[in-house]
Amino acid sequence: MTAEPSSAPPEQPILRRIALSLQYEGSDFCGWQRQNNARSVQAVLETAIAQLDPLRPIQSFAAGRTDAGVHAAAQVVHFDCSGPIPAAKWAPALNGRLPASIRVRESVERPRDWHACYSAVYRRYRYIIHNGRRPNLFLTPWTWHRYHHRLNEENMRVALEGMIGLHDFAAFMRAGSRRPHSRTTIQDVLVEREGDLIRVEIQASGFLYGMVRLLMAQLVAVGEHRLSVKAFEQRWRDRRRDQVREAAPARGLCLLRAGYAEPIFSEAGWYDCQPWFSLATDDPPPDPPCFAKDEQQELQ
């Protein structure tokens, strides 16, 4: 007697969610997000993942959608996989298939309801200005060389500290944004000089399209005394996008890290991911307190 063929649907593979801590040198890419006829970090990464898990379409999600030319020291990415590769083995396996300009520092497994973008409570960006008289070839790929005269970093710090809190930053949002509003919460800022290098860091629940580079150009105007601290504040409080035209170069900007309600990767990795021009005594900034749910939705 021949058994009746089963009409039950085939079993679906059990999917696991893998989180990656990712570094990339952004000069050769059109940004994180996949684009037609351009080389993106997302497309290159997904091609490498598909070589290791070829049985299903691969889609990855990132904590921050960096623009063309912007670097990342510890971008956080997740994807779902169906294969048997242990979570910790994804990092070396991918590094063997990725170009030298993209490195996976660590790979861990996360619950299926965890999301690299929507679970993040903050992102922290760093911008480096080279304020020396002469250009330096070895600093050029990572900094904005700007010297009309010595920048006043104290004025820059005061201007930036006035932005802390939940505000409407429409003045610093480029055209083409898909966000329904221009509000976000700036949680922490830092302006520090070491020799000819000025380091600016901004931590926020989320960033508007083009926000940091537009803001940095205005902040440098404050440092050069072309714009007063009061005029800077009035400009963004009045949401005067027509007065904010110049954007700082992408090469000076780096996505430093994204933060979550609980640690995702090893703390030792924080020190490994620091760009070489950072201060050697850096410590990881403390995690911010739990913010209200509506503030956590101010995501890029």
From Swiss-Prot:
Catalytic activity of the protein: uridine(38/39/40) in tRNA = pseudouridine(38/39/40) in tRNA
Alphabetically ordered keywords of this record: Isomerase, tRNA processing
A molecular function GO annotation: tRNA pseudouridine(38-40) synthase activity
InterPro entries in the cross-refs: PsdUridine_synth_cat_dom_sf, PsdUridine_synth_TruA, PsdUridine_synth_TruA_a/b_dom, PsdUridine_synth_TruA_C, TruA/RsuA/RluB/E/F_N
Enzyme class label: isomerase
GO BP of this protein: tRNA pseudouridine synthesis
Residues annotated for substrate binding in this entry: 125
Pfam families in the record: PseudoU_synth_1
Active site: 67 (nucleophile)
Entry's EC annotation: 5.4.99.12
Subunit structure: Homodimer.
UniProt function note: Formation of pseudouridine at positions 38, 39 and 40 in the anticodon stem and loop of transfer RNAs.
UniProt xrefs under PANTHER family: PSEUDOURIDYLATE SYNTHASE (PTHR11142), TRNA PSEUDOURIDINE SYNTHASE-LIKE 1 (PTHR11142:SF0)
Family: Belongs to the tRNA pseudouridine synthase TruA family.
Protein name in the entry: tRNA pseudouridine synthase A
Source lineage: Bacteria, Bacillati, Cyanobacteriota, Cyanophyceae, Synechococcales
Gene behind this protein: truA
